[in-house]
Amino acid sequence: MRYALERFISDIQAAIVATGKVPADLIEITTPKPNIPADRTFVTFKAAKALGVDPVRLAADLATAIVPPPDSLIGEVTATGAFLNFTLHPQRLAAAVMAEIETYGDAYGSVADGANRTVVIDYSSPNIAKRMHVGHIRSTIIGQALVHIFRALGYRVIGDNHLGDWGTQFGIILAAMQRYGRPQNEGEAAMAELEALYARYNAEMKDNPPLEDEARRWSLALEQGDPTARELWQWCVDLTMRAAQRNYDRLGVRFDYAYGESFYEAMLPGVIEEALQSGAAFRDVDGAVVAELDKLPRFIVQRSDGGTVYITRDIATIKFRLQEFNPSHIIYVVDARQELHFRQLFAIVRAMGYALDVELIHVPFGVITTPDGQPLSTKKGNMVYLESLLDDAVARARALVDAKSPTLSPEERAQIAEAVGIGAVIYNDLYQDPRRNITLDWDRMLSIEGNSAAYLQYSHARCRSILRRAAEEGMLSTEVDPGLLTHPSEQRLVRHLARLPEAVREAGARYAPFVIADWCYTTAREFGIFFEQCPVLRAETPALRAARLQLVSATANALRNGLALLGIQAPERM
């Protein structure tokens, strides 16, 4: 796909080359600052220096010499000092963008930059035998948005849910189930029972040292493949994943793989040996395998008792992914507090000779806080579990939908409430830089005004409502002239719709879904201004009405695509 703004840049380059004054290899087209009345700029300093001419004179000469062809997307060409400024031809741009959105449909905004390359995205990663809480939601939501964005960039994307299903804590869980019995419930209730068993055993263990030995024995039995230990462990894994899947289904999250840490168990001895042989790690006086790389703090790869740690399993995971998927990128969507861990992981992997030409990326994120700024924490007693959070969001959205749309059927109101409530949770996470902490502020999250998912969904539903009414009144036409869209608010909206492919590229380059969220918000805002200033169904002429209806349709389709990249539904009604 070659979009309008790409053709615009090509037109500029061709027009400059056609003057014979600057060769193609000296032309670099940039986006000017917002206060510059231009869409693209050629800054002549570098070219003028190479050609031995004055940059101001070169810009002026080019402005005089350039004559865009009749079908070019170039509008005006002006020189300001050493800056050669280009504006888009508004009518030709409108025709091009309307045609692209109609032709490409759901694929509008997608590009082929990542063709024949693979990205592995590691996200969500809940712990087995524990309920998912709001602490898991950021990785899940950000990771799923990155999956959508990189697929839109043309990559083959492998979404991997790296489950925390191994480690010393399982000795306690298995010992607790043997001591007190396994939970009899299902779903979240069973998960809550497991957590209570773990806490009960942990508390008793402090005053009863033999219980600690028992937990250690179960941990060792699990590692050695004891059938009873493995059966109990698998029961915990299956129970946890069934409960987690209900949350994933509501959030629209789909994984390609869900390999747990246990999957890499057989690789660990080989990984430790490779780390030693490559010189990436060494044995200390206590017999532990440690590494000290890139001026980072020393870290353990294998404990002195022979046990492995998180980083051991993470090294094995990278090795497997390189062999299995041959990726160009491996992206980890993990809490910012793990930043040092990933610096150490990437350093030792490269010191072992792996992933030398692969982008290893850690996408960090902040914590979720209450409206008064307090972090949500199990220890503080204010932790919110994910299922409860989603239920609460949908219940609040249902109250709003019932109040605003009482004539809709109960089934339709329930569907809209689910889309709006879940959308509010997702957008609240994605609309800003992920490094920042986010706040659970329901009033803002569910407002149909301002920067919220509900506002964006309402804008989309408003577009669809206008189009339904136009269809009912026989106003839709196949004969449309986008060149009639000359009002400034129409042209601003068209220009912004044209930016979606650029926003997708920027979001991928920065690993930042908030770029798409910002594009969606600006789309809704520009549509609101257009709708206020330009009557659609009561336009001055039928031809202008047809052009504006086409713009409404294009806005709805592009906004739906933008929301889909974030994992948010776009209801037809609200």
UniProtKB/Swiss-Prot annotation:
Keywords assigned by UniProt, alphabetized: Aminoacyl-tRNA synthetase, ATP-binding, Cytoplasm, Ligase, Nucleotide-binding, Protein biosynthesis
Gene Ontology, cellular component aspect: cytoplasm
Localisation per UniProt entry: Cytoplasm
CDD domains: Anticodon_Ia_Arg, ArgRS_core
PROSITE patterns according to UniProt: AA_TRNA_LIGASE_I (PS00178)
Disulphide bridges, residue numbers: none
Chain ranges for the short sequence motif 'HIGH' region as given in the UniProt record: 126-136
Pfam families according to UniProt: Arg_tRNA_synt_N, DALR_1, tRNA-synt_1d
GO molecular function: arginine-tRNA ligase activity; ATP binding
EC number: 6.1.1.19
GO biological process, one term: arginyl-tRNA aminoacylation
Substrates-to-products reaction catalysed: tRNA(Arg) + L-arginine + ATP = L-arginyl-tRNA(Arg) + AMP + diphosphate
InterPro entries, A to Z: aa-tRNA-synth_I_CS, Arg-tRNA-ligase, Arg-tRNA-synth_N, Arg-tRNA-synth_N_sf, ArgRS_core, DALR_anticod-bd, Rossmann-like_a/b/a_fold, tRNAsynth_Ia_anticodon-bd
Signal peptide (UniProt feature, chain positions): none
Gene3D superfamilies assigned: Arginyl tRNA synthetase N-terminal domain, HUPs, Isoleucyl-tRNA Synthetase, Domain 1
Quaternary structure note: Monomer.
NCBIfam families assigned: argS (TIGR00456)
Annotated family: Belongs to the class-I aminoacyl-tRNA synthetase family.
PANTHER family: ARGININE--TRNA LIGASE, CYTOPLASMIC, ARGINYL-TRNA SYNTHETASE
Protein name: Arginine--tRNA ligase
Organism classification: Bacteria, Bacillati, Chloroflexota, Chloroflexia, Chloroflexales
